[in-house]
């Protein structure tokens, strides 16, 4: 085969080279068409997106944005993967989660899932899941020499570990065939529940036992989900997990375990969100950070971090939960491309209670489709070489390292957690994010955008309650969920939802965009829009409003028609009994009580509206 020169392989070889200056001029022209007078770098900034942690995503990345060399897969700093072959041999480990307190029900689900694509089991034990005494029944019929098991037992970690090891021995499983993690995570449990960890002795003993007898079994899990579920940014999640990992290394070393052996006993668990590029960068940055810890510990070859990625519970919604299938698909893709060793796709009904068989099937099939039909695991580190991904990985790693150093200056994760430093930093991040959610700057499809008021509620059996205390647990949809709950209660009590009359002025071309915007905004709070007749004026508005059954109204039209008719129509609506008259857009008009527009505080508007309507 003839090898072509480089220019023969380049699709752009016959085109003249473009420069940043040329691109900036073209961008200026586009941005100016939107009414903004910008030039130079300001045009690029207008198209940039500010992320949490002080990071910025720009619209264009080129070779001059190249990050430091990420090395090769399987070699320090392990950015491109913990092993040279990545997930190519068989794809990532498809790990399903089980949290039912019923051993028989858990066993039925486990066997069904293992027969249909699941490759390992993640069992939640103790007060938040399955009783430790039910572990044997739950694993009845499971070939323990073939199926890795990951435990998550909180304060009962040592007891659960001993029970699992007893089951391995009873089943005659060879020591070198035992695989999985015992899941001891005293600091993660403290972060989640507030229960202080007084001793690492039991954990160290488990680590020593695994190191000496079970080479495929890890004793500890560094679970970053408690921080993510409290509202942490990606860098805070990474920084807290890094600090926790370092605490465990110190504790194990103090108990006599060698540094290299201590590294081999840790598995890390991270959240994967629907922000696919941030998820990819987060997992790559996590490996780089852990490799740095191994390097300064004098064992650089031990820094290959084992990762378990879980689709984010924070992003899941209770309303229109079917959309969660789309969110978890993107999150799973990000986790796989990011190089996670094991991936758990939470069922779409996760936030509603215990998943049913259909939800579990969709969850496991998400990985199957991405692996078997989309062939995501056929390429090692497919995001590697992307200037954007490499730069985002580098910037995120630096931001996480800064947070890690702040924790270390506070005497480590134990002290920082108990002093409130970690919780305070995360709370501040979540407060800013809540503002974006309230203003719909971070849209939630099916909740704050395009809600479906006529949806039938999805009901599930309640999951075991998580222990109280510790860091708070947040959800993106919580403010809108509260508003929708008030609307539901009103519907049950009166037979109708609170209503808003959409007073559309002029032809469809003039009012459709703002009428659609207003309808979606009010539905996000459970307020039903009434848009009949299609168009009104000052003479017909009062009669139409009275017939609508609504108690508030919202004018929707063009700026030109607002100038001509808004004040007269608003007076007519108030004369007909409207408690409040809104206008979709901005301006200063008599008899208009409030303006709704892109970026307004939708939660505040909807809360005050329901209050005035007497909706409890």
Curated annotation (Swiss-Prot):
NCBIfam families: mmCoA_mut_beta. Its cofactor is adenosylcob(III)alamin. This is Methylmalonyl-CoA mutase small subunit. PROSITE patterns: METMALONYL_COA_MUTASE. Heterodimer of an alpha and a beta chain. It catalyses: (R)-methylmalonyl-CoA = succinyl-CoA. The keyword Isomerase applies. GO terms for cellular component: cytoplasm.
